[in-house]
């Protein structure tokens, strides 16, 4: 019999299989995104019932199979049970899990994404930031981790770091006011929006959720991220549809 593999991760999604089993998707540090089957997890007295739910974060023991893994046990660090009582916060949380599942890859080092999920769920439960801003931060940082961050630190054309006020969605880059006159799809941005994007892209994870913006900047940041994310996410997110209805 194969030895169990210990992995650190978070359950991104769970769905019923058969009469008593569950299929779970776990984002792990060691193996990237994996699919595992929790046998008997839907039985009332199963030790796997509580550990095979979305948001659960900790150490999991799995056995590798031909096409998937089998979940055999877990040592949970955080269940995030209080998120279920936070509305609409919990729906934002489910959206972040779905986005992480979309970008996650099997065999990749997903440490950054896993850490981002953990601090983001804690940001939701603290309740100190506008959930719309938390969403913008998570989306842009996720894109950054995936290697598709926009160039926001110098003009794409001349390289200057001054007067960066024109964004090109087509080029995924910022331009100075002068060079921006020549691009096909100029999108005028306020300096505060550019600064917010820079901070989200480069800030240490521990300080990522340590800032706020005014309503005008937040509105612009939302519009920018909606358009930018549309370029990289081909799937229609079910949880995003719920968030849109709640607006």
Q: Where in this protein do the model-derived segments appear?
A:
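Non-catalytic alpha-helical scaffolds and adjoining flexible linkers that form interface surfaces
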Residues: 1-247
């Amino acid at each position: 019999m194969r030895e169990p593999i210990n992995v650190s991760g978070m359950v991104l999604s769970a769905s019923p299989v058969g009469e008593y089993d569950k299929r779970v998707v776990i984002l792990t540090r060691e193996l990237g995104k994996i699919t595992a089957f929790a046998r008997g997890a839907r039985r009332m007295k199963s030790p796997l019932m509580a550990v095979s739910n979305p948001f659960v974060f900790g150490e999991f023991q799995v056995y590798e199979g031909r096409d998937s893994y089998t979940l055999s046990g877990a040592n949970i660090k955080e269940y995030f049970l209080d998120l279920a009582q936070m509305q609409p916060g919990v729906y934002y949380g489910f959206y972040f899990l779905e986005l992480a599942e979309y970008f996650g890859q099997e065999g990749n080092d997903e440490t950054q994404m896993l850490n981002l999920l953990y601090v983001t769920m804690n940001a939701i439960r603290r309740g100190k930031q506008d959930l719309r801003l938390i969403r913008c931060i998570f989306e842009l940082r996720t894109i950054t981790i995936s290697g598709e961050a926009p160039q926001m630190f110098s003009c794409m054309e001349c390289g200057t770091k001054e007067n960066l006020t024109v964004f090109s969605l087509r080029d995924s880059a910022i331009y100075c006011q002068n060079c921006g006159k020549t691009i096909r799809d100029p999108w005028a941005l306020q300096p505060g929006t550019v600064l917010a994007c820079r901070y989200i892209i480069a800030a240490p994870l521990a300080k990522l959720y340590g800032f706020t913006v005014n309503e005008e900047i937040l509105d612009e940041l939302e519009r920018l991220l909606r358009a930018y994310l549309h370029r990289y996410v081909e799937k229609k997110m079910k949880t995003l549809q719920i968030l849109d209805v709640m607006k």
